[in-house]
Amino acid sequence: MKKIRLELVYLRAIICAIIIITHLLTQITLKHENMEGGSLVLQFYIRNIVIFGTPCFIILSQLLTTLNYQKVTYRYLTTRVKYILIPYILMGLFYSYSESLLTDSSFNKQFIENVLLGQWYGYFIVVIMQFFILSYIIFKINYNLFNSKILLLLSFILQQSFLYYFTNNTAFHDTVLHYYPLSENTIIFGWIFYFFLGAYMGYNYERVLNFLERYLVIMIVLAVATYFVFIALANGDYWNVTSFSYSLTPYNSIMFIVILGICTHFKTILFNTIQMISAFSFFIYLLHPIILDSLFAYTNIFEDNTMVFLAISLLFILGLCIGVGMILREFYIFRFIIGKQPYKLNINAY
């Protein structure tokens, strides 16, 4: 029986909330499309502070894989097709239909561009599915490769080199997009280090926890330092905020480690709520952008007080997504929409 690791339950819930906050801050920026000067720069740096959500989900996904498995069968892939890829497609169908109505455009066009090519917020699932296949291949070769410091270093060099040239070399950028058919955000070379970092941490999980018990403060200082490095490397494009950036790789990676270290100190605080957010995190990730615009139309009245705006918006989004998820959970067939984790929740029946 797998040991329940409370720190990972808290970690998944916090990362989920961080992604929602990222999208809420984006909504504020989009509302003020004429923003410029100091206000735009401030928004840019605030948004980048919490941009680590998607990289952290990639790290966490692979950490859980190498932590819980030492060998895998073909069922490893089929399970992920059923409970990750199929929900992605089904929610994508709903999103494409709603977007076709909203924009008075073709459903087929919306589905192909968004779901098949990954030109929507769900692109992250396309990345994750590629890494599941890569993980399966490595398991079949040798599980101990996940413990390779050389592979970890090479993946860092590959990711940083790819992102640097993709961002700064027009010829390289255009050549890649000419031959790669999907959204640029789904190219795994731009995320490959996060995959191997998660794998390495999962393989050495107890050692990682022991390290964080002693050196968490140092990691927090490093997180601040790497963010200042990002500031120094900023290119002046204050509208474009993305985690698909070489200058944010160290910061994103260290923030995952920092949050994991902080979560090791949580045992019971808001545990029932945290447990539900964690269990429904995949469904929340897919559903919340669909309702975000409508909800923002109300909550933006609190925009002048950013903390109040974020707190109320986060509460409503989590409440709506979990509420819908709890209703769907009553019917086992909806595991192909909400995933299988919600069915593991220990909820008393009356």
Swiss-Prot record:
Compartment(s) where it occurs, according to its Swiss-Prot or TrEMBL record: Cell membrane
Disulphide bridges: none
Tree of life domain: Bacteria
Pfam family name, one: Acyl_transf_3
Main location: membrane
Keywords: Cell membrane, Membrane, Transmembrane, Transmembrane helix, Transport
Transmembrane segments: 7-29, 44-66, 79-101, 116-138, 145-167, 187-204, 211-233, 243-262, 269-291, 306-328
Record GO terms (molecular function): O-acetyltransferase activity
GO cellular component: plasma membrane
Keyword Transport listed: yes
InterPro entries cross-referenced by the UniProt entry: Acyl_transf_3_dom
Membrane topology: Multi-pass membrane protein
GO biological process: one example: enterobacterial common antigen biosynthetic process
Purpose of the protein: Presumably involved in the export of the biofilm adhesin polysaccharide poly-beta-1,6-N-acetyl-D-glucosamine (PNAG, also referred to as PIA) across the cell membrane.
Similarity section: Belongs to the acyltransferase 3 family.
Protein name: Probable poly-beta-1,6-N-acetyl-D-glucosamine export protein
Organism encoding this protein: Staphylococcus aureus (strain Mu50 / ATCC 700699)
